[in-house]
A protein has these predicted regions:
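Short, well-ordered coil/turn segments that N-cap beta-strands
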Residues: 14-18, 51-54, 88-91, 117-119, ...
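A C-terminal functional module that forms or caps the active site or interfaces directly
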Residues: 195-246, 250-254
Length: 283
């Protein structure tokens, strides 16, 4: 099954376009609960309650930092493996933001799709087409989300720079993503943040007729609103089933923003937040 079909299928099955980010805040974990046990507990409860989360996005960096390879310690990789094995049957997006010369990208592509068995991966476009093609050629059934207009405050430093024709760089990148989508496979998508709704609307409108998958961070702790994002996509005619709206710490560590310790009823609080988010992202 190609990636766009997988997105459509799982959006309909879950009646949602939600994506749960897995970005552990280690200082906010309950005392005595390991990172793998923490997330596996939440994932099992999601499955038991039938909560419709339509994709999952673990960030590999949070787990790589736990490894100490020179000491023979791969506890971070093992924790991530345990979490991946516990995921429900929705698309698994490996958030690794790779992108390098072709030979290096080929190895990063195998890392994502061969080693971790991801359905999709995030990559940077900065090094051009030969850094992207290894993720697409030979992996036509996979998804490749290319950073377009990111949700972080520093995204504007380069992405909003005006080109000679007056277009912002992020729009030139969008045009390039659309070209690569046609050239390589329909699984080429874009990462477009929800923290600037005017820019989001411009990009959603551009992508609406091209059926390019969107991964939308910036909702929850970063301030974006799932309801506003969905309203915009409906208004511009973007096919909702190809979108995934991501929220991470607001679902899995709601107390972290206030720098509070994990409460005793952490599981119930998280599941309530996850359930609410899934409904906010309903089709």
């Amino acid at each position: 099954m190609d990636y766009r079909s997988l997105l459509e299928k799982t959006a309909k099955e879950n009646n949602s376009i939600s994506c749960m980010g897995i970005d552990p805040n280690f200082s906010s974990l309950p005392e005595g609960v390991g990172v793998d046990a923490y997330y596996v507990t939440l994932l099992e409860e999601i499955k038991n309650k039938g909560i419709g989360i339509a994709s999952f996005k673990p960030n590999i960096g949070y787990f790589s930092r736990l490894d100490k390879p020179l000491d023979g310690d791969f506890s971070g990789s093992k924790a991530l493996a345990s979490i991946i094995k516990a995921l429900p049957s929705s698309p698994f997006i490996l958030d690794s933001k790779r992108g390098d010369i072709a030979t290096s990208s080929a190895n990063y592509a195998f890392e994502a799709f061969g080693c971790w068995k991801a359905d999709a991966v995030t990559v940077s476009p900065y090094m051009g087409h030969d850094s992207i093609s290894p993720f697409a050629v030979g992996y036509e059934e996979k998804g490749v989300y290319i950073l377009n207009r990111t949700s972080n405050p520093g995204g504007k430093d380069l992405q909003n720079k005006a080109m000679e024709d007056g277009k912002p760089l992020y729009m030139v990148v969008a045009e390039t993503i659309a070209k690569w989508n046609e050239e390589y496979s329909g699984g080429i998508g874009a990462v477009v943040g929800a923290t600037n709704l005017k820019e989001f609307e411009d990009l959603a409108l551009f992508y609406s007729k091209k059926e390019i998958p969107l991964l939308i961070p910036g909702v929850g702790s970063q301030g974006g609103s799932a309801e506003e994002v969905i309203s915009i996509m409906k208004r511009v005619g973007y096919p909702l089933h190809l979108a995934r709206i991501n929220s991470s710490s607001a679902l899995t560590h709601p107390w972290a923003k206030k720098k509070e310790k994990a409460p005793e009823n952490w599981k119930d609080i998280c599941i309530s937040a996850i359930e609410k988010f899934a409904k906010e992202c309903a089709l």
